[in-house]
A protein has these predicted regions:
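Low-complexity, intrinsically disordered segments exposed to solvent
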Residues: 6-257
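C-terminal motif of bacterial Sec signal peptides marking the signal peptidase cleavage site
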Residues: 2-4
Length: 257
């Protein structure tokens, strides 16, 4: 049985950990939910919460009432691939917005309806709260809370819980231009692998996600499973590519995201 961080002695370039392992779980979960964060932030900014259908994949409909909350529906129907990240999704997400997302304490809450991303069914709680401007650099600051289940086609699943701070490090001054956005992600997460092994994770250095890039481009994640050695995923030096390293004890393995 594969349990914690998987140690290899001969492989030099591999996929980002077997999906049964703790590092595989966090790569899948972080990718899934950060992709949704990027999508929602982009469309809310671009739409200005105006009523109407605003996209094709997904179909995006914003319903504006005379007062908050308002709702935005993202509908992938029976399935389509996003032009931004190439990921095929199906089903629906409804985002309820309690107030303008530049007002402190406004909350955006996701509801999942038969939502599937890359073949995996997603359910649970996902919330984004605006905390105001960060002290020192005035970056917009958001709290991200997730408690979710990711179910695979074979009906096995992983549990994932995350509490992050998402900082809008670049691009907040140009709200209608999404491509120049850069986000820094800090926090902690925990979960249970497909094989029932608990793990926790922290971020020794903030993970950076550029809107112009499909992958995390820098930062690191320290993963500690309840069984086996800890490991670190290092996303690199800022270059936009699908490469990272997995460090387990004295071994460093190149991985492809």
């Amino acid at each position: 049985m594969l349990t914690g961080c998987q140690k290899e002695s001969t492989i030099t370039t591999v996929q980002p950990g077997d999906k049964n392992t703790s590092e595989g779980s966090i790569v899948i979960a972080d990718k899934t939910f950060d992709g949704l964060n990027g999508l929602v932030f982009g469309q809310i900014t671009a739409s200005g919460l105006k009523s109407g259908t605003l996209g094709t994949c997904p179909s995006i409909t914003a319903t504006l009432t005379t007062s908050f909350p308002v709702t935005i529906t993202f509908d992938w129907g029976t399935g389509c691939a996003s032009a931004d990240d190439g990921i095929t999704r199906s089903g629906k997400i409804t985002a309820s917005v309690s107030g303008m997302m530049n007002m402190v304490s406004s909350v955006l809450t996701f509801t999942f309806t038969d939502f599937v991303s890359e073949g995996n069914k997603i359910s649970g709680v996902h919330k984004i709260t605006y905390l105001g401007l960060n002290t020192g650099n005035n970056w917009p600051r958001y709290s991200i809370f997730t408690e979710a289940k990711i179910e695979f086609p074979d009906k096995k699943f992983i549990n994932y819980r995350a509490e992050y701070i998402r900082l809008h490090a670049e691009g907040s001054a140009t709200p209608l231009i999404i491509a120049d956005d850069v986000w820094r992600i800090e926090g902690k997460s925990s979960g249970k692998t497909r094989e029932g092994i608990n793990w926790t994770a922290s971020y020794p250095s903030a993970v950076v996600k550029k809107a112009s890039c499909k992958w995390f481009s820098s930062g690191s994640v320290l993963i500690t499973p309840e069984v086996g050695p800890s490991c670190i995923i290092d996303y690199g030096d800022g270059t936009c590519d699908n490469k990272a390293t997995l460090k387990i004890e004295d071994k460093t393995i190149n991985i492809e995201l």
